[in-house]
Design a protein with these regions (language model features):
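Core segments of cupin and vicinal oxygen chelate
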Residues: 17-20, 28-80, 119-143, 149
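Histidine- and/or cysteine-centered catalytic micro-motif in compact active-site loops
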Residues: 53, 82, 89-91
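Zn2+-dependent peptidoglycan hydrolase active-site motif and core
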Residues: 96
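Acidic/histidine-enriched, glycine/proline-rich intrinsically disordered or flexible terminal extensions
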Residues: 3-4, 154, 158-162
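Short acidic N-proximal helix/loop "leader" segments that mark the beginning
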Residues: 2-17
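A structural feature that tracks compact, well-ordered secondary-structure segments
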Residues: 25-27, 85-89, 111, 123, ...
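Vicinal oxygen chelate
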Residues: 22-30, 74-83, 99-116
Length: 162
């Protein structure tokens, strides 16, 4: 299944106004296959398919304001209203590789699906957040705002074309 369609299916129910509904908690890991197997065992569910983010030519990813070819392997556990995402950086500069390098494996971000990406970024910047990464995927786009100093978390925003 294509990356964008998978995202849209998982988050279709999470479309909302503002940041009222948490859609995802994401964990950066060093070995996604091993960690996904452990989570599957713990949750009593099948291990999800591991997918890779698309190339820069499709994502147009920017990290800290510069084009980046950073990529990652992803796995998603749909836990009802919230998804657990596992992320293994696989090359190039990114918020994922920076986090893993600086802090080791751990909770990387919380995500919300929003209708107004730019307005929500401005709102988070008004709360002391800094846009660190953004890009696209088939059917939508994402942005990471680092608000750890003021909100205690990196916040991911997801939006989908309708």
């Amino acid at each position: 299944m294509a990356y964008g369609r998978l995202f849209k299916e998982i988050y279709q129910r999470a479309l909302m106004e503002g940041l009222a509904k948490l859609a995802q908690v994401a964990v950066v890991v060093e070995n996604i296959e091993e960690v996904a197997e452990r989570w599957a065992r713990l949750l009593g569910v099948p291990k999800p398919q591991v997918i890779e983010t698309e190339e820069w030519e499709k994502t147009r990813m920017a990290f800290r304001g510069l084009p980046s070819r950073g990529r990652a392997k992803l796995a998603f556990f749909n836990l009802g209203g919230v998804t657990l995402e596992l992320i293994e950086p696989i090359g190039g500069p990114s918020t994922w590789s920076e986090f893993l390098e600086e802090q080791g494996p751990g909770i990387h971000h919380v995500a919300f699906v929003v209708d107004d990406m730019d307005g929500t970024i401005r709102k988070l910047e008004g709360e002391g957040g800094v846009l660190v990464q953004k890009g696209g995927f088939e059917g939508g786009s994402y942005a990471y705002v680092d608000a750890r100093k003021t909100l205690g978390a990196i916040v991911e925003l997801l939006t989908f074309k309708r």
